[in-house]
């Protein structure tokens, strides 16, 4: 079982932040995973939307 360290909500769906990369203009490039672990994707996320420790 994976422990949630940080999450972000996009379009009313919660995603686990697996990894982060470069930051630019108050956004950070993140690797995100769905809570059930079936979807993994990359997206630019507003830093202020991330909840938890990254």
List the predicted regions and their residue ranges:
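Short coil-to-beta transition motif at edge beta-strands of beta-rich domains
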Residues: 1-11
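Basic/aromatic-rich interaction segments and small domains that mediate binding to polyanionic partners
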Residues: 9-45
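Structured surface patches comprising rigid loops and adjacent beta-strands/short helices at the edges
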Residues: 44-53
